[in-house]
């Protein structure tokens, strides 16, 4: 259970984007975070730079995290989704200025090949990657993001089938 202290509840959410990137087989790109010893898998995500639109941020983050921008946006989430990070992580992330993230999510069709993906980017976030089914995605995801992922899957599921 994610316990968030009253002090941390007063902090704002960091604005960001998340990307559900689909290959031709409707499998979803997931990466294993490089900065933790536990097996923490997630879809690519990142912050929005001031003055940047969420859709521009999504395509920039895709390039930064998977080393390719070969793809196009199928859909944008109808709302902002948010999650809180566990209290012990707050001081370690974003200089302790945010309690979690509020994100606009994008369903993106990847048009490249596996060879186009390069997670050894300038600032790598993943040390492994793979394509996962919807069911796999929800079972391997880091627990404090699971509720958000369930909501994103529910919103985009009809477009994936």
Curated annotation (Swiss-Prot):
Q: Which SUPFAM superfamilies match?
A: Nudix
The Gene Ontology CC terms held by the record are:
cytoplasm
Q: Which cofactor does it need?
A: a divalent metal cation
Domain spans labelled Nudix hydrolase: 12-154
Top EC class per UniProt?
hydrolase
Q: Which cysteines are joined by disulfide bonds?
A: none
Task: Note the PANTHER family from the entry.
Answer: M7GPPPN-MRNA HYDROLASE (PTHR23114:SF17)
**HAMAP family, per this entry?**
Nudix_RppH
Question: What name appears for this protein in its UniProt entry?
Answer: RNA pyrophosphohydrolase
């Amino acid at each position: 259970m994610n316990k968030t202290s009253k002090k941390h509840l007063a902090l704002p959410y960091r604005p960001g984007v998340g990307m559900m990137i689909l290959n031709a087989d409707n499998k979803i790109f997931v990466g294993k975070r490089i900065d933790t010893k536990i097996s923490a898998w997630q879809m690519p995500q990142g912050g929005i730079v001031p003055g940047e639109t969420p859709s521009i941020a999504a395509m920039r983050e895709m390039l930064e995290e998977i080393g390719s921008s070969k793809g196009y946006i199928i859909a944008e989430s109808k709302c902002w989704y948010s999650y809180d990070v566990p209290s012990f992580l707050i001081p370690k992330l974003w200089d302790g200025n945010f309690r979690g993230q509020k994100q606009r999510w994008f369903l993106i069709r990847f048009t490249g090949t596996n060879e186009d993906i390069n997670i050894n980017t300038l600032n790598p976030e993943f040390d492994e990657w793979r394509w996962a089914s919807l069911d796999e995605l929800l079972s391997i995801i880091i627990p404090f993001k699971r509720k958000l992922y369930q909501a994103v899957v529910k919103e985009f599921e009809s477009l994936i089938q």
